[in-house]
């Protein structure tokens, strides 16, 4: 299994920087049992002048808030505050080319009722290009994108990614690099963790919103 931290790695957990090895969460959390949490996947890059820059942090953290409010999770953090915390987290861990994962998660709740609070963790780890630079062999998945009438697909919610995990696992088990998911009408929708773009005659085409999670770079 991949290792994302060591004995010295720091994460930001509910207002404090703590060592990842010392971090704890409630095992009765509604997030753990029902996938009721929202998150972002943000990249940072080491620039030619040696500084570290986060890619579109405002857009990512604004979407984190939108995802939380869309699925009725309490949210009280400010985007500017979270960007500052993330910059500090990268510096403390001496990270440049990194993947940043903020997660808003629920307290203990073994029912389906609304919570009166949410918690926040921000983690970061060194990361190479997501799928590398080689051409990929992709396979149309037997799993469809979910019905947009059954879920708020514009929310980047954890539970929704079981669909992505199954599609990706299926493709790799059959010898492919990644999956391509179709919508309910059989149209191309997206990959398990990325939007799809096609270049034709000098123009870019991408599936419309509806059955997809509209990406920040889309």
For the regions a protein language model found, what residue spans apply to each?
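Short secondary-structure junctions
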Residues: 91-98
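Short, internal active-site loops enriched in acidic
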Residues: 105-110
């Amino acid at each position: 299994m991949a290792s994302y931290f060591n004995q010295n790695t720091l994460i930001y957990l509910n207002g404090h920087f703590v060592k990842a090895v010392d971090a704890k969460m409630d095992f009765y959390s509604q997030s753990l049992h029902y996938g009721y949490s929202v998150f972002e996947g943000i990249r940072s890059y080491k620039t030619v002048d040696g500084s570290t820059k986060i890619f579109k942090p405002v857009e990512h953290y604004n979407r984190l808030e939108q995802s939380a409010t869309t699925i009725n999770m309490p949210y009280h953090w400010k985007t500017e505050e979270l960007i500052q915390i993330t910059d500090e987290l990268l510096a403390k861990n001496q990270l440049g080319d990194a993947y940043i994962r903020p997660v808003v998660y629920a307290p203990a709740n073994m029912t389906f009722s609304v919570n009166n609070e949410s918690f926040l963790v921000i983690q970061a780890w060194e990361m190479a290009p997501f799928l590398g630079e080689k051409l990929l062999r992709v396979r149309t998945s037997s799993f469809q994108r979910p019905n947009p009438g059954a879920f708020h697909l514009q929310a980047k919610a954890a539970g929704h990614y079981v669909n992505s995990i199954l599609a990706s696992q299926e493709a790799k088990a059959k010898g492919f690099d990644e999956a391509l998911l179709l919508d309910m009408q059989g149209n191309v929708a997206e990959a398990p963790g990325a939007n799809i773009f096609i270049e034709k005659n000098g123009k870019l085409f991408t599936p419309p919103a509806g059955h997809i999670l509209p990406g920040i770079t889309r």
